[in-house]
């Protein structure tokens, strides 16, 4: 019996309700796994496949991958991941789950969740609203706080390898992607990486290269009890999952943008920045278009692999091409803008800022800076808490506007747009914010 035959027997076994006391079985196939949903449980086996980016071709490799999946994902979703279970062949020749016979396959056992609550399904239903986008930004920031730093992560070398592998994989699909497009994308991506290498190396030294999720698209996030829970992190290659935290975030931003959810993507980015409160994160915005482009190219080649497995399916062809086109779009030059919105409290500055932000380039839109949030950050309190009276002293106000000006300068220097929401009562405040625009176009609005 070949490996394929052996695994097909396991698939047939796990697909049969008769082996689960008649409980219906729902089967879900991906390019690298097959999941069987039964009652309140899910059994996930690795497919006996080998791609340029993963190898599950032997039973030993699939067992190791299952064990790694549990180890990695329990940090994100301990309530979902239960353990690794053997599929065994018993003395009577029958298969069993967790039996005493020889293991012929390995399964990740999980607690089943409502699959219509995954965020890709919610996106299709138009249910990713501003509140959920805010929660997403918080959830990713929380996950990254827990992610272990990796010394000598060689992030730029890894990115160079990923770019080269993306180009090779897309080139191998001439029916889907034109050679000219693939070559142009590869060249533009390499050039973009060269421009930000010193920045990324500095961030690695600062501990911002971490063992992250690695596959943070909407299909790998689910709502449980109303809160977004991240699952299905990459387990098969620590190198792929290790990188700058913004490279991890970029997958989610890219996926939202590809689905036309620009407002949600902008809210996620702004919430993430607010939660992390790292001023030097504003500098890494210079690398965000590159990160999103690489993620889009990865998605294109993964969908191409699925197309190859399933045969010609127009929706997969179109999807793969859309992601490849988006990868190129992210690298197109964009003219950043700095918009200062002034006026007294209650005049609608914040509403206007949130409305304008997703429409400004580069994607996913402008970073919104608010004087009230900046003031509360100085006092180390949450943006929903009330400030003490001393927070409104002249000295504090000077510090607030200096902080806003410095952040606006960093954002525009990184090639991104910024919107500053503040009173701007004095001419000095208005003059200084205009100077921070660098080469970006400046617009001042007073409500």
Name what the model sees in each region.
Residues 7-213, 218-298:
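Conserved ATP-binding subdomain of kinase catalytic cores across diverse folds
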Residues 208, 334-339, 415-416:
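Pre-Walker A (Motif I) flank of P-loop NTPase domains
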Residues 236-243, 256-259, 382-401, 422-428:
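Short, contiguous acidic/charged loop-to-helix segments that flank catalytic cores in large enzymes
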Residues 349:
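Conserved lysine of the Walker
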Residues 352, 356:
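Hydrophobic positions on the alpha1 helix immediately C-terminal to the Walker A/P-loop
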Residues 357-416:
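Conserved substrate/cofactor phosphate-moiety recognition/catalytic segment
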Residues 439-447:
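Conserved phosphate-donor/acceptor-positioning beta-strand/loop module used by diverse small-molecule
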């Amino acid at each position: 019996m070949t490996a394929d035959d052996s695994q097909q027997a396991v698939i047939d076994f796990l697909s049969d309700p008769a082996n689960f006391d008649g409980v219906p079985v729902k089967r879900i196939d991906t390019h690298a796994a097959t999941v069987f949903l039964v009652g309140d449980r899910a059994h996930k086996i690795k497919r006996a496949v080998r791609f340029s980016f993963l190898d599950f071709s032997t039973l030993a490799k699939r067992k190791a991958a299952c064990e790694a999946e549990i180890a990695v994902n329990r940090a994100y979703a301990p309530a979902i991941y239960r353990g690794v279970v053997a599929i065994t062949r018993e003395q009577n020749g029958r298969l069993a789950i967790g039996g005493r016979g020889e293991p012929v396959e390995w399964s990740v056992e999980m607690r089943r969740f409502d699959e219509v609550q995954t965020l890709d399904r919610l996106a299709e239903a138009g249910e990713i609203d501003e509140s959920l986008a805010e929660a997403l930004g918080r959830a990713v920031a929380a996950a990254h706080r827990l992610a272990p730093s990796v010394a000598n992560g060689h992030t730029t070398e890894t990115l160079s390898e990923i770019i080269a592998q993306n180009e090779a994989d897309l080139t191998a699909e001439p029916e889907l992607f034109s050679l000219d497009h693939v070559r142009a994308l590869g060249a533009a991506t390499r050039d973009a990486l060269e421009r930000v290498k010193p920045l990324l190396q500095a961030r690695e030294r600062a501990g911002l290269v971490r063992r992250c999720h690695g596959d943070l698209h909407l299909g790998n996030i689910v709502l449980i009890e109303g809160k977004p829970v991240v699952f299905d992190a990459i387990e098969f290659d620590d190198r792929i999952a290790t990188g700058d935290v913004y490279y991890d975030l970029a997958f989610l931003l890219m996926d939202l943008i590809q689905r036309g959810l620009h407002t949600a993507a902008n809210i996620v980015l702004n919430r993430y920045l607010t939660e992390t409160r790292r001023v030097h994160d504003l500098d890494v915005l210079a690398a965000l278009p590159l990160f999103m482009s690489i993620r889009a190219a990865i998605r294109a080649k993964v969908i191409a692999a699925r197309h190859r497995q399933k045969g010609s399916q127009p929706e997969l062809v179109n999807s793969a091409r859309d992601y490849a086109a988006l990868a190129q779009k992210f690298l197109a030059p964009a003219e950043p803008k700095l918009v200062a919105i002034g006026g007294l409290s209650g005049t609608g500055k914040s509403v206007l800022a949130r409305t304008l932000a997703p429409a400004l380039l580069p994607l996913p839109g402008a970073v919104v800076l608010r004087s009230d949030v900046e003031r509360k950050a100085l006092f180390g309190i949450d943006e929903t808490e009330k400030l003490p009276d001393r927070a409104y002293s002249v000295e504090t106000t000077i510090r607030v506007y200096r902080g806003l000006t410095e952040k606006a300068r960093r954002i525009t220097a990184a090639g991104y747009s910024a919107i500053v929401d503040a009173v701007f009562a004095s001419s000095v405040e208005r003059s200084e914010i205009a100077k921070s625009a660098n080469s970006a176009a400046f617009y001042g609005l007073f409500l």
